Every structure is written in C-alpha cells, then in structure tokens.
Amino acid sequence: MAESYLLEKLKSVEQTFNELTRRLGDPDTAKNPDEYQKIAKSRSSLEEVVETYDNWKIAQEELIGARQVLKEANSDPDMHEMAALEVKELEEKIDYLETRLKVLLLPRDPNDDKNIMLEIRAGTGGDEASIWAGDLLRMYSRYADTQGWRVKLVSESLGEMGGFKEVILEIQGESVYSKLKFEAGVHRVQRVPATEAGGRVHTSTATVAIMPEVDEVEIHIDPKDIEMTTARSGGAGGQNVNKVETAVDLMHKPTGIRIFCTEERSQLQNKERAMQILRAKLYEIKLREQQEEVTSMRRSQVGTGSRSEKIRTYNYKDSRATDHRLGQNFSLNPVLEGDLETVIQSCISQDQQERLAELATSSAAG
C-alpha cells in the first residue's frame, strides 16, 4: 500500500486537475486567451500524474479481485496457478506505478524549462586543453542538434593551436537546463595530443559551467559595480573593419568577472549580451552556493554542479568515456559525436533515486 503522504498528495493533485478541467470548459475562460493558455499549461503539467494515479487505482481493484479468485481456487490447481500469476503481476505493476508516482511528485527544479548559457573553459594541459575545449563544443553542438535546440556562439577566446581558451554558447529550446545541468563540472581527457611528437598520452581538462538564463528581476546588478570599455572588433576585412568600436569589455568589480563580447553587430547589442552573460554567471554562483548547502546535507553524487567536481574521463586508448558519478563506462566515439542521451538519462534517473531516498527518510522521520 502506498504511503499516506503520497495518497494525500495524489488526492490533492486530482482535485486541482478536476478544477482546472472545469475552468477550461467555462465559456468565460475561453474569452481570455492568456488565461486559457495558462490554465491549459497547468492542467497539462498534472495530466501524467492523474493518469498514473487512475491506473494505480484500477490495478488496486484488480488485485482485490485476483486475490479473491486465488482464495477460492484452492480445489482447482490450474485456476490457482493462473490466479497466483495474476496476483504477482499486479503487485509488480502497483510497485512500478507507486515508484513512478513518487518520481512525478518530486519537486521540480524551477530552472528546468529555462534556456542556458554553456561555458567551456580550457583547464590544465596547455594547448591540448584548448583543443579539448573545442572538441567538447562540437559534442554539445551535435547533441543540441539531436534535441532540436538552437545554438548560438556568444563569446569566444581562441586557443593558439586551435580550439578555445574559453567559449560561451547560448542554447535555446525545450527542457535545455533540465538535461544539460548534469554536464557541469570538470571533463578530463586522456589521449596522445596532435601537438605531441613523442606519442605520449597526456591528461588535460576543461571545465563546463551550465548557467540558466535569467532576467533583470531575478538578478539585479548595480550600474556602479560595472566598469565598461569598448574596443575595435576584428572582422573578415573590408573598408569598415576595425574602424568602429563595437566590442565591449565589461568588468563586474565585486566578483572580478570579466566578459568580452564581439559577436554582435553593434556596441549596444554587445553590451546587452555581456550583461546577459553576467546575469547568468551571477545566478549560477548563487545556485551553486544553494546546491552546495543541499549537497552537504544530501551527500548527493549526481548534479551538484560543482565546477571542481571531476565528472567524466574520456580515455581515447580504451575508447571509453567513464562517468564517475554513475560509476559507468560508455563507448567513447558515440559520446563525442553528441550521443549523450543515454548518459544524461542515467544521471537524471540516479538523481531521482537519490531524491526519493531523501523523501522516504524525511517522511519516516515526520
């Protein structure tokens, strides 16, 4: 039988769902398109919970019937065997539905539906680290393509031998943060660099930060804390190149965060873009502090988002990508080609199990 806290929550969700369904059918609601859309979205977010709860209730009724048949079939071995099998199958189905309901009722991360800024910084390993940062950029761009997301380069600092010392992408689409938040941390590569004549295996790293996009209301920046200079933006040649100062070099004095933006066409656009990146960076710092508090309580293995956490090692010699949080190996080439869905879904699943265990502990204590 499901825990009482779960049943209470499910009854409450069902009542809310029925009320939203009633309001959608109200002619007055239909007159206000914004209100109608808002209610429809709220109702849609509860649909899977209510459907799963209905299936659970049906399975409970069927189980009562199957147990009754089992009780009455003692004199008929064949009927007894069939009824016993049905009871077993229904009990397994109910267990599965209860676990699914618990997952569906876990509190949603308020940032899950947000677009993101994805920052990759070359770490230890010199030129090879910059090349590795470029490989990660390609991996995430390809993964974004498979998801139907839009990717735009917003800031870059090129490496001397290729790749990037630092690069920031804007990624927009459905559920971007909910999936890519598990990619934050240190990505380590072990391979023979193209720059290495001796053929020795080197270890290099790059750090990935996942920053949900935020508006001015969520993160307020005091203009007095900003120091901004302009510079001439490099270009592909022609009459106007380097004559107009469109590039923006922005410094946030309290944190020392510095952003250089050249990708947009005008100085105003570059300033707006730099402020957008700064807001995302400040929000990510705030989130990280909150997550570290939660992590110290949960001792979570997945999704802490810590920049210093080594999350994955890509070993070229063994054609293996090892995710250290999961303790699992994946085939290297598909991962580098952007086939990240299996890895990310495994991280999501482990995070859910961790949170379910926490929920069970707190419910037992309560």
Curated annotation (Swiss-Prot):
Predominant location: cytoplasm
Subcellular location(s) per record: Cytoplasm
Keywords assigned: Cytoplasm, Methylation, Protein biosynthesis
Post-translational modifications: Methylated by PrmC. Methylation increases the termination efficiency of RF1.
Annotated positions of the N5-methylglutamine modification: Q239
UniProt xrefs under HAMAP family: Rel_fac_1
Protein name per Swiss-Prot or TrEMBL: Peptide chain release factor 1
Source species: Nostoc sp. (strain PCC 7120 / SAG 25.82 / UTEX 2576)
Gene name tied to this protein: prfA
